Amino acid sequence: MADKDMKWKTLSQKYLIEKPWLTARVDKVELPTGAIIDEYYVLEYPDWVNTIAITKDGMFVFVRQYRYAIGKTVNELCAGVTEKGEDPMAAAKRELMEETGFGGGNWQKWMTISANPSTHTNLTHCYLATDVERMDVQHLDQAEDIEVRLFSRDEVMDMLEKGEIWQSLMAAPLWKYFAKVK
């Protein structure tokens, strides 16, 4: 049996805010059933990237920074935003170098996920970089206050199990890593 077409039809779009880091719009849509949703809110973002970076001696490279929206200082994978027209892997390598000073190594696409496919237009491209090494100092933006932290495999697993990796887009590739790489 063939899958039925569940695609919605866009009847209209109205932009509410257009900023470099966030664009919000309200769409009027028609469902395959004929039902109309007059106000369906959509958030447009550039694609995001994050990297599980592991040094030659098996240490995981994390960043520690304050996250205003949740009011917490947290440990995270190195992550960032793709620039317009930028290849996601190039963006991930750039972000790792800028935020941590680490680079080089062996890179592979790990997974692609969505923060919220019902309201967000962007994807998060996750990478695994092994055998990275410190190659430079951090080159932070004016608004960034980031500490580089190195954790062992056991420490990262412990943070995951305790719910201390707050960002779900970072927890997912880490859980995949621990499920696949013994």
Functional labels for PLM-detected ranges:
Residues K14-N50, K56:
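Acidic, metal-coordinating catalytic segment for phosphate/diphosphate chemistry
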Residues T10, A24-V26, I37-E39, V63, ...:
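Hydrophobic residues on conserved beta-strands that form the core of alpha/beta folds
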Residues R25-T33, N116-M135:
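Active-site-adjacent beta-strand/loop module that shapes the phosphate/pyrophosphate-binding cleft
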Residues M1-K19:
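Extreme N-terminal tail/first-helix region
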Residues D3-K7, Y40-Y45, N50-R94, L140-Q142:
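Conserved Nudix-box catalytic region and its N-terminal flanking loop in Nudix hydrolases
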Residues V26-E30, A53, L128-T130, L150-S152, ...:
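Short, well-ordered beta-strand micro-motif
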